[in-house]
Amino acid sequence: MIGKIDHIGIAVRSIDEAKKTYEALGLTVESVEEVPAEGVRVAMIRCGESRIELLEPTSEDSPVAKFLAKRGPGMHHLCLASDDVRADDARLRDGGFDVLRDEPTRGAGGHEVQFVHPKSTGGVLLELAGEPHGDEGAADGDADDQQTAGDAADEGDAAGSPR
């Protein structure tokens, strides 16, 4: 079951530059980590009960780098907190939604995550995130054989979906 908005993901060229805006507003970066499976460096900024996630590409061919090249910096995805990602994943599949992974994987902060393609959600890349499991910060999602969340966000335009 979905409980709240967990975070809003924003694609940026540089976390160090982008965080200045949020620091000027009195917010602070809680954590920074690399998620190799997605080819990004991630900074989490607390904002009330939710967070802002800054996504900086770590290679020129990463999905976030492609997103930035096509669309420029800006909102990448909306993440909803789930108390049971696997049950929500099954409910979405049963409802005909296009999820991006064969099963939920581990993302930033060790959270179990699943992504829903923008063509299934009116143009918004949705991420479902559960509680952290195992070693926090260790992301084990295999992006090589599955479509990545960044690729799907970029395809939102190709599918005629709004940004």
Positions of the model-derived regions?
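Short, conserved beta-strand edge motifs with alternating hydrophobic and charged residues
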Residues: G9, E53-L55
